[in-house]
Design a protein with these regions (language model features):
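Short, surface-exposed beta-strand/strand-loop-strand elements in extracellular ectodomains
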Residues: 51-73
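C-terminal interaction-tip segments
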Residues: 1-37, 101-117
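Buried hydrophobic-core signal for structured, non-transmembrane domains
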Residues: 42-47, 96-99
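Residue-level signal for short segments within beta-strands and strand-turn junctions
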Residues: 48, 61-63, 113-115
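Short, solvent-exposed loop/turn segments enriched in Ser/Thr/Gly
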Residues: 37-43, 91-93
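Extended, low-complexity, turn-rich repeat/linker tracts enriched in Gly/Pro/Ser/Thr and Asp/Glu
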Residues: 48-56, 103-107
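Intrinsically disordered, low-complexity Pro/Gly/Ser/Thr-rich segments with frequent PxxP/GP/PP motifs
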Residues: 65-96
Length: 117
């Protein structure tokens, strides 16, 4: 099914996804290939919950087996927050927003998005 024409929207559902970030690329938001929806990502915050050590984060848009970096190995200082998204963008059908950390259990993510159909 094709993604909806966002001029003729029927439903907009606000959502929030949360995730402890690991050292393997893992999706925080996935728009399945035949969803009939488009996802509007409004905010992505990465918190370093380790009180001592800095940690790096990589965020990518994964499309058709290819990772397109939004941020690549950006340092998140201990006890700090990184605001990754400065302006909203869309995840089309088949797209995922993935996160990878340099150290497991140091970083957590909160992502606010809308499912549009």
């Amino acid at each position: 099914m094709a993604a909806p024409n966002i001029v003729n929207v029927v439903t907009i559902t606000g959502k929030t996804a949360v995730q402890a970030i690991t050292t393997s690329a893992t999706a925080i938001v996935t728009n399945s290939a035949a969803s009939g929806k488009v996802f509007k990502v409004n905010a992505l915050y990465i918190s370093n919950v380790d009180g001592t050590n800095n940690a790096d984060v990589t965020v990518d848009l994964f499309r058709s087996s290819t990772a397109y970096r939004i941020v690549n190995t950006v340092v998140v200082p201990a006890d700090a927050v990184l605001d990754v998204i400065s302006k909203s963008f869309y995840l089309e059908e088949g797209d995922s927003l993935r996160l990878t950390a340099s150290a497991a259990s140091d970083l957590e993510a909160v992502c606010s998005y809308e499912e549009i159909s």
